[in-house]
Amino acid sequence: MNSSFHLHFLDLNLNATEGNLSGPNVKNKSSPCEDMGIAVEVFLTLGVISLLENILVIGAIVKNKNLHSPMYFFVCSLAVADMLVSMSSAWETITIYLLNNKHLVIADAFVRHIDNVFDSMICISVVASMCSLLAIAVDRYVTIFYALRYHHIMTARRSGAIIAGIWAFCTGCGIVFILYSESTYVILCLISMFFAMLFLLVSLYIHMFLLARTHVKRIAALPGASSARQRTSMQGAVTVTMLLGVFTVCWAPFFLHLTLMLSCPQNLYCSRFMSHFNMYLILIMCNSVMDPLIYAFRSQEMRKTFKEIICCRGFRIACSFPRRD
C-alpha cells in the first residue's frame, strides 16, 4: 500500500505476488513493516468456491417457488454482491498471473485503469452488501412487528423496486469511484458510509430484539395468529443477525486499514496493522464463502433445494431427504 492514499489492489497484489516469488523479506516502499504475502492460488481458490456457492444460492431461489419471497429476493441481491467480490478477485488474480509471467504486456497507465475497475467492483460489492443487509433487516422488522399487514406492505413489486434502487445506487457509487479514484474524499466517503450503515443496522437489531419477544406474545394471543409463523420470523431475524455478524467481522479490518491509511500511514503501529492487507482481502472473500453456508445451515428449504440442484437425476434415491412425520 503506498502513501498516496489510493486503494490500488492490483498494484498491491502484484507486489505481494512478486514477494512470494522472490522471497519473504519484501517490504512496502512506504511502510517500515514487511507486507504479508499470500499466494495468488489462495485468492483464486476462494474466488472460485464463492462464485460457485453463490450461483447455487441464486439458482435455488429461482428454482424453488417456496423461496419466492421478499426476504429471499434480498438474499439473492446479497449473493450477487458476494459474486461480484469473487469475480473481481478471480479476474484480478488471472491478470496478476498474466502480467507476472509476461503473457500480458501493457502500459502502467492502463494497469492503473484496470486497477480502478477492480477497486470499483469492491466498492459496489460492499455498498450492495450493506444495502441488501439493511433491506433484509427491514423486511424482518416488518414481518415481526406488522405480521398481519406484511403481505400488503412488502409486496413482490415493492421488493423488486428496492433491489433495483439498491443496484442503481451502487452502480453510481462505482462510477464515482472510477471518475474520482485519485481523491481521498472518495475513500473517506466509503469509510463513513460503512460505519454509518453498520451503526444503523446494529441499532435496528437491538431495537428489534428488545421488542420482539413481547410483540410475538401479543400477536400469538390474537385470534387466528400463527405461532409457527412468528417462530419462522424470529428464525429469519436470527439468520440475518448471523449474516450481519459475519459481514462485520470480515469487512471491519479492511475499513480499519483504510482509516489508518488516511490517518497515520507512517506510524509504526499503523504500519504493522496495514502490512496484513492481503489477509483482510482474504477475510472479505471468506465472507462471500460463508454466507451461502449460513443460508444452508439456517434454512431447511434452502438445503433441500441445494441437494436437488447438486444431485443428478439418477441419484435421487441416494440424495433424497428423510421425510418427517
Curated annotation (Swiss-Prot):
GO terms assigned for molecular function: hormone binding; melanocortin receptor activity
Transmembrane feature ranges: 38-61, 74-97, 115-138, 156-179, 187-211, 240-265, 274-297
Cytoplasmic side: 62-73, 139-155, 212-239, 298-325
Entry keyword Lipoprotein: yes
Record's keyword annotation contains Membrane: yes
BP GO annotations: adenylate cyclase-activating G protein-coupled receptor signaling pathway; G protein-coupled receptor signaling pathway, coupled to cyclic nucleotide second messenger; regulation of metabolic process
Extracellular side: 1-37, 98-114, 180-186, 266-273
Reported effect, Q235K: 10% increase of binding to alpha-MSH
Function: Receptor for MSH (alpha, beta and gamma) and ACTH. The activity of this receptor is mediated by G proteins which activate adenylate cyclase. This receptor is a possible mediator of the immunomodulation properties of melanocortins.
Family: Belongs to the G-protein coupled receptor 1 family.
Protein name from the UniProt record: Melanocortin receptor 5
Organism: Homo sapiens
Name of the gene this protein is made from: MC5R
